[in-house]
Amino acid sequence: DNAKAAKIYNEMISDKNCSIFLTLAGSTSAGGCMKLYSDLVKYNMVDAIVATGASIIDMDFFEALGFKHYQGSQFQDDTELRKNYIDRIYDTYIDEEELQACDQTICDVANSLEPKAYTSREFIKELGKFLKDNAKKKGSLIETAFDNNVPIFCPAFTDSSAGFGLVMHQEQNPNKHITIDSIRELRELTEIKVKSKQSGLLMVGGGVPKNFVQDTVVCADLIGKKVDMHKYAIQITVADTSCLLYTSPSP
């Protein structure tokens, strides 16, 4: 399966008419894979990214601020972890106070922007601009994408520290604040698909990012734009084979 996936990905990269979408879900970023994703951007191996808010904010942006994830145990008592202000992603630990500092940074960036509607792509681009001057750890996916003009979309953006930070921002600015326009975001991603002669998907995990990028074909059809289905697809997952809508396709 790995050899077959590598062959398909080589075909994507060799196809000059193909736009490559990378989708990220799950905890591979906290597990140490973010440098790999940054390299895909750096070496022009992907054209757009669709990710969960957790992957982009709670893992990538969080570490760019100088914070870390720690190897722990999946068997640790959660009540004890809570007493010590430690959050857990299976066997990976996060300092809750550091996460709240990340929330506050999101709030601060939002406070600095013109109060209007932004797509997650536009807001993440502002985070990339912020990291250019303020990152404690260079080479994050957000900053690398900013440097290489690769858009990052997070359709479930508020399901992360971004959500907490933006709630704080709106609480502090009840009459004039920013909002996230998820409808325009779908339109933006669909336009990338429409303008692409061919497209390929490199999907890590499933969930919202996988569904969102696949929905671009349907969305294009509904607004009267004729597009082909995605020509290439690779999904890296531990899920069992089942209905395509909900889990992984058959090899």
Mark where each language-model region is.
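Short active-site-adjacent structural elements
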Residues: 59, 210-214, 241-245
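Ligand-binding beta-strand-loop-alpha-helix segment within the catalytic cores
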Residues: 80-162
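Conserved small/polar residues in nucleotide/adenosyl-binding loops
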Residues: 246-251
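Short, flexible loop segments at boundaries between secondary-structure elements
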Residues: 228-245
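Metallocofactor- and cofactor-centric catalytic cores in central/energy metabolism, strongly enriched
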Residues: 1-66, 72-80, 84, 88, ...
